């Protein structure tokens, strides 16, 4: 997600400084872009203070989405956010601190009604719990720092691998169904999220607010896979994974990687996530406050994403 945002900022004429961990030798998708690099660590406040010195805006997009322990999630999502806010709170030039949270911080909708910002946060995974805790940290520092919090739903697009596995199944002619087939989703195309981040950052109206940002349309997982199958020219066969089977596979996957430093892609919490019926939210408040309108339909976004996956040899 960060690389899409960096590209948009450069297109708009901003000078961009990216914080890169000391332990990371490569720059990933931004390695060929005209940016300034600041080496540092989210666990070293002095390095964060040096990296953010003199900046007008801080966009905190990094986070831990997969980990093997509560400590790793907490350090990557809560402690990192606290340290960054501690580092920037006395910067006299700072106009906005934009924190990218997640729909996971609010949890799924229980009755199918898209969640709004005043819905109580009931996260169901450790990732969601720690993103909600990080939002609380933002609220505490919001007394001294101009902050906006964005909660995107599932994000897809070029460079993103979160939906890659499902699209690989579709490409093989298989349409997986997890639990109930009437699963409903809010989605957002990655470059559109970058545009929303910039809108939220530059608007004075957004300071002190939390927003869901998404495509206003709600899709079923079946509909999403059928659109992908049509683009790929595939006929698909539905294969159902009952809840008990998905949990069994997840448990075996966790056990198999228990001695590895690599977290399982499908673990028990991810299975719980996949089995929820309604991962939906309403972006109406964000639209009302900023005028932001999603400009990329699901079919357009999937077409571009699938084309990119093929070009990269991912599909």
What spans do the regions from the language model cover?
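Glycine-rich NAD(P)-binding loop of the Rossmann-fold in SDR/ketoreductase-type enzymes
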Residues: 43, 72-83, 125, 129-130, ...
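Substrate-positioning beta->alpha
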Residues: 129, 133, 160-165, 178-201, ...
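Catalytic helix-loop patch of NAD(P)-dependent Rossmann-fold dehydrogenases
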Residues: 110-155, 175-179
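Conserved Rossmann-fold NAD(P)-dependent oxidoreductase catalytic core, especially the SDR/UDP-sugar
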Residues: 79-126, 148
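N-terminal Rossmann-fold cofactor-binding loop
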Residues: 19-24, 42
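NAD(P)H-binding glycine-rich loop region in Rossmannoid oxidoreductase-like domains
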Residues: 35-76, 106-108
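N-terminal Rossmann-fold NAD(P) dinucleotide-binding loop
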Residues: 2-3
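Mid/C-terminal beta-alpha module of Rossmann-like enzyme folds, strongest
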Residues: 199-266, 283, 299, 303-306, ...
């Amino acid at each position: 997600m960060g690389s899409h945002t960096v590209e948009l900022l450069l297109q708009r004429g901003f000078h961009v400084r990216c914080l890169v961990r000391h332990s990371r030798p490569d720059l990933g998708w931004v390695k060929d872009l005209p940016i300034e690099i600041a080496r540092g660590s989210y666990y070293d406040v002095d390095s964060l203070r040096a990296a953010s010195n003199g900046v007008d805006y801080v966009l905190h997009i990094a986070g831990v989405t997969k980990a093997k322990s509560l400590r790793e999630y907490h350090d990557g999502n809560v402690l990192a956010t606290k340290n960054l806010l501690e580092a920037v709170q006395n910067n006299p030039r700072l106009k906005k601190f934009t924190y990218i949270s997640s729909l996971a911080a609010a949890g799924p909708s229980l009755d199918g009604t898209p969640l709004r910002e005043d819905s109580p946060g009931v996260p169901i995974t450790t990732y969601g719990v720690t993103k909600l805790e990080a939002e609380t940290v933002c609220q505490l520092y919001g007394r001294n720092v101009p902050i906006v919090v964005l909660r995107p739903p599932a994000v897809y697009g070029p460079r993103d691998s979160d939906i890659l596995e499902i699209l690989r199944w579709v490409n093989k002619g298989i349409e997986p169904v997890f639990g109930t087939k009437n699963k409903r989703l809010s989605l957002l195309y990655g470059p559109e999220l970058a545009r929303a981040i910039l809108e939220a950052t530059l608007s004075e109206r957004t300071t002190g607010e939390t927003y869901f940002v998404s495509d206003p349309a709600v899709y079923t997982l079946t509909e999403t896979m059928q659109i992908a199958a049509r683009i790929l020219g595939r006929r698909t066969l539905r294969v159902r994974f009952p809840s008990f089977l998905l949990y069994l596979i997840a448990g075996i996957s966790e056990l198999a990687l228990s001695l590895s430093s690599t977290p399982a892609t499908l673990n028990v919490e991810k299975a719980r996530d996949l089995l929820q019926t309604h991962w939906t939210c309403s972006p109406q408040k964000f639209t009302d406050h900023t005028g932001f309108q999603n400009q990329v339909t699901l079919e357009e976004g999937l077409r571009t994403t699938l084309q990119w996956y093929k070009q990269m040899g991912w599909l």
